[in-house]
Amino acid sequence: MGLTSQLIPTLVCLLALTSTFVHGHNFNITIKEIIKTLNILTARNDTCMELTVTNIFAAPKNTTDTETFCRATTVLQQLSTHSCSNKLLGGLHRNLKTMANMTCSVNEVKKSTLRDFLERLKAIVQRKYYRH
């Protein structure tokens, strides 16, 4: 009986450490996938890159990365019905949604091209990756 009561705290600690490792590992995989996808998309030279999208980066400077990812997810969701939507944009949307883990609205009036949107998003994601 004494051995069991000593093992329980040890097992709980090991479980907590394992979940932290898995979360950090998944985060690194997700952020690397996002960067890879953004690199592929921004290298394209097709008419879809000239689509007009909401400029979420015109928001206040004190916007957190999570809020930015949430807003980017919303913009990509709005593109999902467009003929330019493809598997890469869909995958980017899914990965950003896991990073944001919340829903939000986008009300900005300013617009930018999809290329500019993706380039600025790539810079933010890369910064987050190097800080992590």
Swiss-Prot record:
- Enumerate the UniProt keywords alphabetically: B-cell activation, Cytokine, Disulfide bond, Glycoprotein, Growth factor, Secreted, Signal
Q: What SUPFAM superfamilies is this protein classified in?
A: 4-helical cytokines (SSF47266)
Q: Mind telling me which SMART domains this protein's record contains?
A: IL4_13
Domain of life, per UniProt, equals Eukaryota
Example of a GO MF term: growth factor activity
Asked if the keyword Signal belongs to this entry, the reply reads: yes
Query: Where does this chain mainly localize?
Result: secreted
Give me the glycosylation sites of this protein.
Answer: 28, 45, 62, 101
**Example GO BP:** positive regulation of DNA-templated transcription
TM ranges: none
Where found in the cell?
Secreted
User: Which Cys pairs are S-S linked?
Assistant: 48-84, 70-104
- What does UniProt give as the signal peptide span? 1-24
Explain the purpose of this protein.
Answer: Participates in at least several B-cell activation processes as well as of other cell types. It is a costimulator of DNA-synthesis. It induces the expression of class II MHC molecules on resting B-cells. It enhances both secretion and cell surface expression of IgE and IgG1. It also regulates the expression of the low affinity Fc receptor for IgE (CD23) on both lymphocytes and monocytes. Positively regulates IL31RA expression in macrophages. Stimulates autophagy in dendritic cells by interfering with mTORC1 signaling and through the induction of RUFY4.
Q: Which family does it belong to?
A: Belongs to the IL-4/IL-13 family.
Name listed for the protein in its UniProt record: Interleukin-4
